[in-house]
């Protein structure tokens, strides 16, 4: 299981959506944080390089170019747009996917985990339910053989998203269960693309740096949702 954490507006949803679309692996995406119009518009921009303004207009007017529509159709991704899904609803969606395709998806995305309704929870600790949810998603990954990615927030000092976020910067300190935790922050010099910096702050299977100061820098053009290596 992988946890991807960042401040609001940093680009964590764009990062994971671009990964799902470009990998072209069978994906079930629980998009609790964004509606269908937003996700389709983002997807059009990611695949075409169009500006978000152009993509949203094309989606609204149902005038997406045929070549782009065909590209979208060929990507094996299904979305669930429940704004606050329960664990039962997540299980039902997975069972329906398995019944339809006779297999579980290679990738499951939960965007984001704070939108999931859990029955466990302590009135004095709003994040106790999230700890249980991590156990649940971890077990889901084991049972389905899927890569499960959960998106999550960070603590107040890192909400600006302009500096490296350590493992301790995860909201609710729920990094115990996931095998991998990535944190994202963005840097801009005011000219050209932003740098979307990805820190591996936990990795049971390889190198990590809990401080977040060791990161991979990706080129991020927010207007067109393009995320690439700088030397692409």
UniProtKB/Swiss-Prot annotation:
One Pfam entry name: DnaB_C
GO process terms (BP): DNA replication
Top-rank taxon, per record: Viruses
GO molecular function term, any single one: DNA helicase activity
Record-given protein name: Gene 65 protein
Organism of provenance: Mycobacterium phage D29
């Amino acid at each position: 299981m992988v946890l991807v954490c960042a401040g609001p507006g940093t680009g964590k949803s764009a990062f994971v959506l671009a990964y799902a679309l470009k990998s072209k692996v069978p994906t079930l995406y629980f998009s609790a944080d964004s509606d269908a119009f937003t996700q389709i518009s983002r997807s059009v921009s990611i695949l075409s390089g169009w500006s978000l303004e152009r993509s949203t207009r094309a989606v609204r007017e149902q005038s997406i170019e045929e070549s782009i529509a065909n590209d979208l159709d060929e990507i094996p991704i299904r979305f669930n747009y429940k704004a606050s899904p329960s664990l039962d609803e997540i299980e039902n969606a997975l069972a329906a996917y398995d019944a339809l395709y006779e297999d579980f998806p290679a990738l499951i995305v939960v965007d984001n985990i704070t939108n999931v309704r859990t029955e466990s929870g302590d009135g004095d600790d709003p994040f106790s339910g999230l700890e249980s949810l991590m156990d649940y998603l971890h077990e889901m990954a084991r049972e389905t053989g899927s890569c499960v990615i959960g998106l999550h927030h960070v603590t107040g000092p890192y909400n600006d998203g302009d500096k490296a976020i350590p493992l301790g910067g995860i909201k609710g300190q729920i990094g115990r269960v996931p095998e991998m935790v990535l944190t994202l922050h963005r840097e801009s010099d005011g000219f050209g693309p932003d740098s979307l910096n990805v820190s591996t702050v936990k990795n049971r299977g390889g190198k990590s740096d809990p401080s977040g100061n060791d990161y991979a820098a990706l080129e991020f053009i927010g207007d067109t949702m393009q995320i690439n290596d700088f030397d692409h």
